[in-house]
Regions:
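Short, Lys/Arg-rich, polar N-terminal cytosolic tail immediately upstream
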Residues: 2-9, 13-17, 21-52
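Short linear sequence elements within intrinsically disordered, low-complexity coil regions
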Residues: 19, 26-29, 33, 123, ...
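Polytopic alpha-helical membrane-helix bundles and their juxtamembrane interface segments
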Residues: 38-102, 138-141, 148-271
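Hydrophobic/aromatic-rich structural module bridging two neighboring secondary-structure elements via a short loop
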Residues: 105-147
């Protein structure tokens, strides 16, 4: 049996790119128009609702319990000097991932602050792989915020709008993202090896899992949580014995990733 490969003509490729650009421009215009219509007070009110609205008592208790752990740890460890950077990195990170699990766009605000602080901590600890990953995270925060807001604004005409619309990967998507994970891991590993890193392919593990996790999160895919779990477990090993706050943060991340997988799986079934 002869299988004929389908060739994409330059005209078809240009048409596809043009359609994507038009969709992006339309969605961006809708987001800007919605923001202009709301005004500063309206945006502040919307942010307040996103942060505090529609949360059950169980969700409030979960948020308060996990987000209080960095403060409990800081003020009960018996050390005279407080690690304020570690404390706020841990707190903003925990709040961020809980908001992600709940499908709240405000997670990106906490994510931006967390990325800035974590960048400093990683640089001071000479974890240069983490530094590069954190720079990528920081850049992705406004992109992710736009994508989530665009999804919300452009789905407002649906009869039954949901707080967020989760998606799941098909087998083709799995193959694509697993291949991309391997490429990033190997590529960054050789890059670190070229600058004589002592652990090139170990450092590049979180580059790959973090990178794909962020892409899937931006695209509203449930499978992001699998990559976050892998990232969290490896990061616990990476920071072991170095910074107590960051270790605790990743343990909480792991727990929240399991919760996030459960919540997003329910959202996928409702979609």
């Amino acid at each position: 049996m002869v299988i004929k490969n389908k060739k994409i003509s330059p005209e078809a490729l240009c048409t596809g790119l043009k359609q994507k650009n038009q969709t992006f421009a339309r969605n961006f215009r809708n987001v800007c128009m919605a923001a202009k219509k709301l005004g500063i007070k309206g945006i502040a009110k919307l942010l307040w609702q996103d942060l505090f609205g529609g949360r059950s008592l169980a969700q409030w208790l979960y948020l308060l319990a996990l987000s209080s752990l960095p403060f409990i740890l800081e003020f009960t460890n018996g050390q005279a000097k407080h690690d304020w950077l570690g404390l706020f990195a841990s707190w903003t990170g925990i709040v961020c991932v809980i908001l992600v699990a709940e499908g709240r766009a405000s997670n990106y605000l906490f994510g931006a602050v967390n990325s800035a602080i974590y960048l400093i901590l990683s640089f001071n600890a000479s974890f240069y792989g983490e530094v590069l990953t954190t720079v990528y995270f920081f850049i992705m925060q406004p992109i992710g915020l736009y994508t989530w807001l665009s999804n919300r604004v452009n789905e407002q005409d649906k009869e039954e709008p949901s707080h967020f619309e989760a998606k799941k990967l098909d087998w083709r998507g799995w193959l694509k993202y697993l291949a991309l994970t391997a490429l990033i891991w190997i590529g960054m590993g050789f890059a670190y090896k070229s600058i004589h890193s002592h652990r090139p392919f170990r450092d590049s593990v979180t580059d790959a899992t973090n990178g794909i996790g962020q892409l899937l999160m931006t695209g509203l895919y449930r499978e992001q949580w699998i990559f976050w779990i892998a990232t969290n477990l490896f990061s616990i090993y990476l920071w072991w014995g170095s910074n107590l706050h960051i270790q605790a943060m990743y343990w909480v991340y792991t727990l929240n990733s399991i919760v996030g997988w459960y919540q997003w799986s329910k959202a996928v079934k409702k979609a």
